[in-house]
A protein has these predicted regions:
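Boundary/linker segments flanking structured domains
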Residues: 1-64, 68-69, 73-148
């Protein structure tokens, strides 16, 4: 059976964004332990404005020309991710994962775990041992959690 009545409110756009961000999704699943509530596909830099209000994310910036990758985290994506960022000035694609509210306090730890995981597989600016399975280089500078 389809919808037979639809009421428009001034809050339609707000609720649409909340649903798209899966803000309420975790409420409907009892004992949900999922750390990430949403992953995006790779997005072109020209569309950054559409995503700048995303909260509690681990993000990935890719520079396809120079074959570089940068990983970071942000409580607000727009406050951290901007064109021309010094660590990876020519990035042209990005993606991000939204962290479940239950894990917001662990955002930095999740970021560092992600950096260390990528560093183990690809060349990196920290000169950490890796398998070299990509022609991209991880350009993060902070590898304090890396254990040789």
């Amino acid at each position: 059976m389809g919808t037979f009545l639809k009421v428009k409110t001034p809050y339609d756009n707000l609720f649409r964004r909340l649903v798209e961000s899966n803000v309420f999704g975790w409420l409907s699943v009892e004992n949900n332990k999922q750390m990430v509530t949403k992953y995006t596909k790779w997005i072109d830099i020209k569309d950054i404005k559409e995503h700048e209000n995303e909260k509690y994310v681990v993000y990935y910036l890719a520079d396809e020309k120079n074959k570089q990758l940068y990983i970071g985290s942000a409580e607000n994506l727009g406050n951290r991710v901007k064109p021309g960022r010094k660590e990876i000035p020519e990035w042209n694609k990005f993606m991000y994962a939204i962290v479940h509210p239950q894990f917001h306090e662990n955002l930095k730890e999740i970021e560092y775990h992600t950096i260390m995981s990528f560093a183990a597989f690809m060349n990196n600016s920290g000169n950490k041992a890796n398998l070299g399975i990509s022609d991209y280089t991880l350009v993060n500078k902070d590898y304090k959690y890396y254990r040789d």
